[in-house]
Amino acid sequence: MQVGIVGGSGYIAGQLLRMLAFHKDIEIKIVSSKSHAGEKLSRVHPDLLNILDLRFSDMDPVDLASRVDLVFLALPHGTSINYVPDIYEIGTKIIDMSADFRLKDPDLYREWYGFEHNYPDLLEKFVYGMPEFHRNEIKNSRYVSVPGCIASSTIYSVAPFSMLNLDNNIVTVDAKVGSSGSGSGTDSSKNYSERYNSVRAYKPVHHRHTPEIEQEIKYISGKNIKIAMSAHSVNMVRGILTTSNIFIDLDEPDALSQLREFYKNEKFIRLIFDRKSNFRYPDPKTVIGTNFADLGVISDGYIKRIVSLGAIDNMIKGAAGNAIQSMNIMNHFDESEGLLIPAAFPV
């Protein structure tokens, strides 16, 4: 199958290229970047030297989409929406990496992303790209919207407990994110000198992944659970650790059993419970470069809560990995093709 990538110079596109290069069912045909047109991919993605001998194209996204079987849109939020309607008319399969088609309620885009969504009919066409919860829908769809990275880690952590009797139906989430989560732009706050030795509360309230987390948890549990999230940038390049406080009276063996049973058939979900290991709880260090989500849970009887931990690579399980897993399902490939890669350890 021939695929193309629009917005090929960003970090997420780089991870798509790294994994698709070794996918036995895929030919990468066109990769576009207006700012790097004509340059070799390896100039921007040096890890691809001697791996992919391609150059960036400046081809119009719709024209590009017409020449491939499936297109990945790796564009900033609010940009994909300008091209999807025309690509939809062509009939090319779409996997959108932005937030433009994640939310089912178009009014939420005004509140959380600052733009009007004028294509509510297309919102219904896109499936939320979490294979663990939408496998059958993805299998029968041509259009997938990949979840946000913090949203992914939070949903994986909270979902197994969301159908239980939570106190007040409120979950508090502390998210710690590496610098690559901000993308490859030139904002000075991303500079090494600004971020090094810093733990910055960059979004202590009103994080824009909140509505998609609440939307997905309602889909899974049928309940309106509120998410109170605070997000921090930390001194690492890639990875996310979410710590979710779920207020429920549940002892640790039962909490672990709930988590284990919920994900018992999921190859890319790993339960971390080894109190003698250096990594006794989920840690981003052990998932870097992989499509795994590492989950763990601890019970706190003192105030009747459980603490559910999730660690993912923000650029893989939080973006490119889930995109490729969804692509595999959509096209009836082996779901794990191109994705069973262990972490580089130590790093």
Curated annotation (Swiss-Prot):
Q: Which residues cross the membrane?
A: none
Which keywords describe this protein according to UniProt?
Answer: Amino-acid biosynthesis, Arginine biosynthesis, Cytoplasm, Lysine biosynthesis, NADP, Oxidoreductase
Check the UniProt entry and state the signal peptide residues, or none. Answer: none
According to its UniProt entry, one GO biological process term is: L-arginine biosynthetic process
Q: Where in the cell is it found?
A: Cytoplasm
Which parts of the sequence bind NADP(+)?
Answer: S9, G10, Y11, I12, N314
Show the InterPro entries listed in the entry.
Answer: AGPR_type-1 (IPR000706), LysY (IPR037535), NAD(P)-bd_dom_sf (IPR036291), NAGSA_dehydrogenase (IPR050085), Semialdehyde_DH_NAD-bd (IPR000534)
Tell me where on the tree of life, at the top rank, the source sits.
Archaea
What exactly does this protein do?
Involved in both the arginine and lysine biosynthetic pathways.
State the name under which the record lists this protein. Answer: Putative [LysW]-L-2-aminoadipate/[LysW]-L-glutamate phosphate reductase
- The organism is Picrophilus torridus (strain ATCC 700027 / DSM 9790 / JCM 10055 / NBRC 100828 / KAW 2/3)
